Amino acid sequence: MHDIKQPQGIIYIIRKEECNMKKGMTILYKVHNNLYVNLTNRCPCACTFCLRQNMDTVTHDDQTLWLEHEPTVEEVKAEFAKIDLSEYEEVVFCGYGEPTERLDALLEIAKFVKENYQKPIRINTNGLANLIWKKDVTPELKGLVDTISISLNTPNADRYHELVRSKFGDQSFDAMLS
């Protein structure tokens, strides 16, 4: 296991290639009554509590959530075609990476789901999309995403920085709150 160090305020994030986790192509997976969409392994954070640091999977059927490659929009649509969405309450963008890292794909898939399945859509996020894209992305989500769940994790910036270890450093906490 690699240690994460912070010399001179620089954050080093463990890369998937440095870990010994198995990879697969679990694009869609079920949690309770919801269908989850796993779009990427990329994340601007290295949270000390994140399951992906130590586990291949969080699903009951033991399928890995580490992706061999980022699925294309067409691959995701093909996965949707294989299942009956009537048994799910909502579609949730959440996997082993930050879903807004692939904002264009997320938006295209959300539009596809809205047009074809009329299911509520939620994004589970670290809340740093505006830093990732260097712009306010919230207008792009309007009409496509019904709920955004932001992982707050701590009540203050110092503790947040200590636990979340965002590559954006000190600006992350305030950006996540805005």
Predicted regions and their residues:
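Short Fe-S-cluster ligation motifs
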Residues: 73-94
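Short, Lys/Arg-enriched N-terminal segments with co-localized hydrophobic residues
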Residues: 9-20
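Soluble or luminal CAZymes and related metallo-dependent hydrolases
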Residues: 68-75, 171-175
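Short, basic/glycine-rich phosphate-binding loops at helix/coil junctions
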Residues: 54-60, 87-91, 156-159
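Short hydrophobic alpha-helical segments enriched in small aliphatic residues
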Residues: 3-4
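Canonical Radical SAM [4Fe-4S] cluster-binding loop centered on the CxxxCxxC motif
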Residues: 24-71
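Conserved AdoMet/S-adenosylmethionine-binding subsite of the radical SAM
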Residues: 81, 96-178
